[in-house]
Swiss-Prot record:
Name listed for the protein in its UniProt record: Uncharacterized protein L27
UniProt source species: Acanthamoeba polyphaga mimivirus
Length: 146
């Protein structure tokens, strides 16, 4: 794949990471650079929020992503004609926070994306995550972000 991309850098075979320069997630530049990555079958994951800003802002980053990603999927990526499988290549949360935050917000995330995250981070105890998802789905938080 050509490296004309300015918003992402290749960090490992098939894995791209969002550069430290902040770029609006809904900007045309972001869309034009992320679409080819997500559509490329050789790309396994695109890390959006693996940057050091978690160390500076902590849970605020997580909460903002939780609120933004649902409408971002719906509005921005819908226009990009990406498949769900391509969208699930996105990795949103810093590694250290993945398990707690995914379990706490389980009803918010598509199940297939959770399993994609699990495979990226190789999270143990997937049965606990699945059990948590089933429990949270019936919880009132299900409508919290809709």
């Amino acid at each position: 794949m050509k490296s004309e991309n300015t918003a992402f850098k290749k960090t490992a075979e098939g894995i791209y990471e969002f550069l430290d320069n902040p770029l609006q997630l809904t900007s045309e530049k972001f869309k034009s650079e992320i679409e080819p990555l997500l559509k490329n079958p050789e790309v396994k994951y695109v890390l959006i929020d693996s940057r050091e800003d978690y160390n500076h802002q902590g849970d605020k980053i997580i909460r903002n992503n939780l609120r933004l990603v649902k409408s971002w999927y719906k509005n921005t990526l819908e226009d990009a004609s990406l498949t769900e499988k391509e969208i699930y290549k996105l990795v949103w949360l810093p590694k250290e926070k993945v398990m707690d935050d995914l379990m706490n917000q389980g009803s918010f995330w598509p199940e297939e994306w959770l399993f994609s995250m699990k495979s990226y981070y190789n999270i143990p105890h997937i049965s606990l995550l699945k059990k948590s998802l089933d429990t949270v789905k019936s919880d009132k938080n299900q409508n919290k972000f809709q």
